[in-house]
Amino acid sequence: METLLSALATLYANTDREQKLQANNYLEEFQKSPAAWQICFSILNQDDSSIEAKLFAAQTLRQKIVYDFHQLPKETHIEFRNSLLQLFLAAKDSPRPLLVSLAVCMAAIALHMTEWHNVIADVFQACSSKDPSGRCVLQFLSVLPEEASDPRKTSLSWEELCIRVDELLRDNGPAVLELLVQYVDAVRASGSPSSADLGLVLTSLISWLREIPLDKVMASPLIELAFRSLDDDLLLEDAVEFLCALFNETKDVDETTDAILMLYPRLLELQPKLIAACDDPETFRALGRLFAEAGEAWVVLIARMPNDFLPLVNCIAQVAANDTELEAIKFTFAFWWDLKQMVELDVYAEARQLFAPIYLELVRIIVRHLHYPRTEDLAINEQMASNEVLFEDRDAEDRFRSFRHEMGDVLKDCCVVAGVSSCLVQISSQLIKVLKIKESGLPYYWQDVEAPLFALRAIGRMVPANEDQVIGSLFQILPQLPENNKVRYAATLFLGRYTEWTAQHSEFLELQLNYISAGFEVANKEVQSAAAQALKHFCYDCREQLVGHLSQLHMFYLNAKTYLAPDPLMEVAQGLAHIVDIQPVANVYQSVHSFLAPSLQSILLAQVKLNPTQAELEALADNIDIVTIFLSLVHPPSPAGELHPIVRLFQDIWPILSRTLDTFSDVLICERISKLLKNFIYTFKEKAIVTLPVITEALIKGFEKTQYGCFLWVSGACVRQFGVPEMDEQTLSAVWSFVGKQCTNMFYYMSNKNPKEIPDVIDDFFRLMMDALLANPQMVLESQMLESLIQAAMMSLQLEQQEPLQTVLNFLQDLLAFALHTPPYSLIEPLPDSLLKSLADLLLKNSQELYIILFNGMVFTFPRDNISDASAVLIPLIRLVFAADPSLCIKYMSNVLDQLPAMTIGQEEREKFLANFSKHCTSSEMPRLRAHLQDWTAMYRRRVLTPRAKLISDD
């Protein structure tokens, strides 16, 4: 015990992190040991034990009950329970964290000691005599439902858990309600009850709410207690939590109308309190949440009975309007969306008409909340527009920006209910008003311009292209906008959102393009990025109008390339590529070549530089991306049988790209060229077949030289496109010879590397193999390398990264599906039975090793997200083995269980697991078998791998 206490002291002392980690590791191992049971009891029984030691002991006991209950002989369960109950009662006056921890221990023993049948009555009886205050029984009741209903907090099977939950919770709900009512009556009779006691009653009632019939809850005096508690600052949060939980139980309005009609008048009585709380942010936030969650729960009834529930909708609008701290309004967002979803249905047209004015007023409210912070000093306020961050730090700025987009979504809801035109007028009138003030020379704040512009951008997709009342007049006031970065950024993105409208109203095109183009000259990254994004949308949606101006756009591009940052330049290139794409096909080659010429020249210059810097490599990669954009997005139809002009261009520039691969072994450059090749293949498909020989040669050479996975994922594109049975024999032979060479290189690479060192390459390789299986399974299954592939897959199962491991498991799953005559996808022609039998024999040959690897991975090494993938391999493997030899299947499972550490699994548990396993295998209940395996392995992992308590922070 001294070592234990010393480790705890180290954790709480001002020692270095290494010592804390060592102490933490010791304590975690202690928590898993059989000796922990007795030592924890000793600590809790000693009056002189520190509160930290007692808390640790209580937490450890709870973990022992959850994970290691099998370590206690069944004949000791009653004695253990009684001892724990005595400890719990003795702690009635202890600090709350210790009392809560011991209550959780009692809840855990109540769940796992399945032979204990009168839990609530026994605990209540014990507490009545030893703890007249009721703290213990209330604390126990408040934690029991959560502990009992979470499958992650138990070692019981799902069936056992369901039975136990019914016995502990559902059969006791009314009795618990009666007990809570009796407790409240008793404490009131004895004098003035404390807020802490009543808060615990409300917390307990929240925990049990789902287990008690709603009519019994509504008939109890606890409803009155909850509403009265809203006047007590110490009980406000507990009361709101309970009432919100109660509202949530009334969502099925057809079944709970009576309860709603009882609660609704009481809620409306709180409106004066809501208004009075405008200067009390905490109370306003709590009450705002109460009204909003009531609206969410009753939204169906609100749509059906709009006149009756209009006062509630007005109250929720008041929450949005009066929330100066922007803390309560977020609770209303879901309600506005839910109500919109209801009233846009024709059957609720009356409700839509009634609520439209509220939604229109909500537009005004939202625009007001969209404003950036400002200062009354106009000169300083204007300078703020040049600041990158307007809040105390970047995180606060990012949170506000994210919050603005949420409010923008509410504006879209307003458009549906109040009408797009009305919302446009509401927003634009605010913008026009401030611009008139500006034009008259009076002082104004740029925030009053920026917020409506953001709002107009937010509702852009709601505005139809034939709108002819508002948008055109808004575009005409562009010259009146104040010139600062924040306003220009907002206005530019606003223009970019209305490009589909502009395509139908081309008379406004030049005005907007001039405004956007001016943004490129502003020395601000955000403004330039917005201009590039807007121009991209214009080039796509207005390409028919712009194709005649391609020469001017080409000059603009050449100029922009000299000063734009890479990201906005890419967006500009994407936009221009869309215009080039709709030219006559005869002009495409020359046009694309002219846009690519600067990038190709830069690539050539980079090839002769010695020892390029990282910045120079990144610039080279960016130029390769420009080439990728044009080769991917420009693909106009071309006459059948003719070489596509972009394919011809690819052939002409291939020597430059090939020499770049030969010159640079940097992963960044190889990946960018690989991306180019993959996009080119998928864009031009069979038209690109003439380039296949040079591409596959480069991929073989590149992978052999660098072992970069990027060459494998392009190989997969080649196989999927050109390795399918429909291809001619010569192409098929070339493709599968190419696949064989890539496999040979990979096997050699894996023979010299630990798989854990190359997870990404393994991921890319097995993605290639899955592409090969999908393209032509017969070629893969006939391959002489199939056994080597299976061996490589098994070797790769020692990986610990989720994505590559999932890829390997998916590959094995596909192989097993073929072996079981259940191919993972439809085939044009069935595969020969002899081929499938050979595959099955090969898998059976490796079945024991694969069985062990998969099971051990599921219980020890695989990431949690891979467990379902692993079971999707193990289950068909079990089917395959069981069909060949049932006794062998049981033997495999028995052997892997025998290899588990003895103290981690009891004999009774082992026998029960094997019995269920055998039963499910024999009856071919594969879904039940899968659930059985996944539930048990999840429980075992929690027992063995999960840290028993997070005792130190990660920072």
UniProtKB/Swiss-Prot annotation:
Transmembrane segments: none annotated. It comes from the Eukaryota. This is Uncharacterized protein C11G11.07. Gene3D superfamilies: Leucine-rich Repeat Variant. It comes from Schizosaccharomyces pombe (strain 972 / ATCC 24843) (Fission yeast). GO terms for cellular component: cytoplasm; cytosol; nuclear envelope; nucleus. Residues 23-90 form the Importin N-terminal domain. GO terms for molecular function: nuclear import signal receptor activity; small GTPase binding. SUPFAM superfamilies: ARM repeat (SSF48371). PANTHER family: MRNA TRANSPORT REGULATOR MTR10, TRANSPORTIN 3 AND IMPORTIN 13.
